[in-house]
Amino acid sequence: MKSVKSVFFVILVILMVQGVSMSAQQSPKVRAPEITGGRGWLNTDKPLSIAALKGKVVLLDFWTYGCINCIHIIPDLKKLEAKYANQLVVIGIHSAKFQNEKDTENIRRIILRYEIEHPVYNDSEYAVWQSYGVRAWPTQVLIDPAGYIIGGVSGEGNYDVIDQVITKVVDEFRKKGELNEEPLKLVLERAKVGDLPLAFPGKILANAATDRLFIADSNHNRIVVTKLDGTLVETIGTGEAGAADGAFDKATFHRPQGLALSGDTLYIADTENHLIRRADLKSRTVETIAGTGEQTHDYFKAGPARSVALSSPWDLQLVGHVLYIAMAGPHQIWMMDLDKNEVSTFAGSGREARLDGPLKEAGFAQPSGMATDGKTLYVADSESNIIRAIDISEGTVKTLVGGDLFEFGDVDGTGDDVRLQHPLGLITYGDKLLIADTYNHKIKELDPKSKKVTSLFGTGKPGQSDGTAPSFYEPAGLALANNKLYVADTNNHAIRVVDLKTKAVSTFRINGLTPPAKNMQALETATGPNAEEIKVAPQKLRAGTNGSLEIDVELPAGYHLNPLAPQRYKIAIDSKSVTVDEKDASRAVKDLKLPLRVPLNAVGAGPANVRAQVTLFYCREDNTGTCRIRTLVWQVPIEVTSDANAPTDVKLQGKLTATD
């Protein structure tokens, strides 16, 4: 593959600069290697190949899901997919940096979190990466409809050059009659799963004085406010992705993360809008206070907060009248002077590195979590797998514990001997720090003085077990109140509560919380999601009786109905011979018990057709993996008869599977 390595990174730029035609005679003839050697495909029901995609322009996106730069280009990929819907196939080649990122189920959850709609290949052993000579994340490689490499580029901000080349390639191969413009049909991961009250919650904030818990319900694009006992207070945001200011029920966000509280003011890191928002808890309004809505690629900017662009603000900490911002995009810590309404760079050169020293010379790597005791700003430096300490008054940065960009693992100990894996959350606990060691699925304790780290909770493997031997699934946010630790257990779509006295863990239940209306409406289609029609033989009912429609569904071994999701059913009848009360005809039921029994009245003799539909959300009993959603539909011909021996009940049966 020497020829691939030597040419493909520069061809694309040369072609654009010189305006060279993309014909086979004028561009280097390097056949695109096939996509093999990994653990399989997602977002498609069958394997894809370069050969089978002949006639399509193919864009390979080499990425790893913990990389902020890889996340930044997802909107560009979506724009390209929309613009060239019938000519272009984008394929994500997920070549993992971290061990945790090699797991196909973890990649599936990231696909769901970022609403990725193109096929993704799990290149867990770097087979495709090596065959294409890739050197960095993210890298995009463009392949022409004849199956030859056009070129490749690395990093962010390459939309325009890729767009222009695709336009030329499409025009040329269309003229030659060698362009396949039939849309590629895909089976997306999102079609296989349901929606829960919380979706990938990121950060969390607790306030004992006001009995409030604030949850960044990131993938529902809203903030959920509850009491500490789980009573729902309100939601901030409609659930739609957007950046609208205004009343709580009109405002919109886009995957919010970090939160900070001052009195009746809640500050919100609106991550994918690249904004800082302010929610007034008294007037119940949202206002944008920093950012332009565009992503910056600058490292040292300062000025009026609304005129300076930001880049993926991930966490917030308030010290006095200064709001510190973990700016994951440029690998820096920024600050906002709330009195002057000005933002500026606080720490970090912009170089992705583990480098201690003076504020502006230090190097960070995707800082994503912060905590403070008022004097020191502690930082979870995720991609370097370390915990940093910034002395605010002295203006210095030092590393407390951990490895480096490619030195990670799960090892307790002291100082540089400690190994973490992409930690995202921090909080002070007395004179200690608690760490959400995200990719190790653990909560750990750090003594900043001795630099000793000890694992406290979690098995090191993903799960959702409560009790004194708990398990988590990529926990990302931490909050403390009344000697209880609240954990945003992101991949479990849940908030977990650790009683720091008893050391027992429970799952936090929010009474009355449902997914945003737009999410529920999407599920209420005419036939329901993932519908299966079940044929039923004609049945008889005895006239003049009050019986029931009994629906029993067999779940796959090791699965249970999700108690947090509303199970839904609808009953429709086309005759007056059989009736069902309006209140029983269509319902959403939490904690549904099977078999389901719906009262049914056989009024008088005659034929009737009953249509019964149930939509069930079911998950593994250990709550690992994604939950599934399936709709079963029965069409039942019924004869209501005066026969005294006829039954009074209609019984329907169905079966769910653990496979798609």
Describe each region flagged by the PLM.
Residues 112-116, 122-165:
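Thiol/disulfide oxidoreductase modules built on the thioredoxin-like
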Residues 182-202, 230-255, 285-312, 342-366, ...:
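Gly/Pro-rich loop segments of beta-rich domains
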Residues 230, 502-660:
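Extracellular/lumen-exposed scaffold segments
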Residues 23-50, 527-534:
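N-terminal "domain-start" segment that seeds a small globular fold
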Residues 62-79, 558-561, 626:
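Conserved redox-active cysteine motifs that mediate thiol-disulfide chemistry
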Residues 49-68, 90-91, 612:
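Short active-site neighborhood of thiol/selenol oxidoreductases, capturing the structured segment around
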Residues 144-203, 513-522:
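Thiol-/selenol-based redox modules, centered on thioredoxin-like
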Residues 71-113, 124-128:
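Structural microenvironment flanking redox-active thiols in thiol-disulfide oxidoreductases
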